[in-house]
Design a protein with these regions (language model features):
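Binuclear metal-dependent hydrolase catalytic cores
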Residues: 1-137
């Protein structure tokens, strides 16, 4: 199993726009961090935990060519805003299973309604299979 930390920054990323904080002004490459996401490769499977607004860049930089499923930890934009960027994976692999608590799935349906439409769905819209995570474990 291999685990790749694609992003370990804050909800705004690092550096923060307009910030004078020393870390934000640092020239050290370790102080340039994208928003949180993890890519796990296990045998022939590939999973992503959270896909925020930096998801596209993270996939291109990491060389990830396949994602079998996405797990969303919670509904904040810095963990979910990259949902639209799963389309290239849909084109190659079809529907993407997404795992999340029910409140997260409901939030995604509100924010990305076009993804979940069943009638007159926009051609090329992401295709997902929501799978609810329950707390009974």
């Amino acid at each position: 199993m291999k685990v790749y930390f694609l992003g370990t920054g804050t909800s705004q990323g690092i550096p923060v726009i307009g910030s004078d904080h020393p870390v934000c002004k640092s020239t050290d490459a370790k102080d340039k961090r994208l928003r949180v996401s993890i890519w796990i490769r296990w045998d022939n499977y590939s999973y992503v935990i959270d896909c925020g607004p930096d998801f596209r860049q993270q996939m291109l930089t990491s060389g990830c060519k396949k994602v079998d499923a996405i797990l969303y930890t919670h509904e904040h934009a810095d963990h979910t805003a990259g949902l639209d960027d799963i389309r290239p994976f849909n084109f190659r692999q079809g529907e993407m299973p997404i795992y999340a608590h029910q409140r997260v799935i409901e939030n995604l349906k509100e924010r990305f309604g076009y993804v979940f439409e069943t009638v007159n769905k926009y051609p090329g819209a992401p295709s997902v299979l929501p799978i609810e995570i329950k707390n009974d474990v």
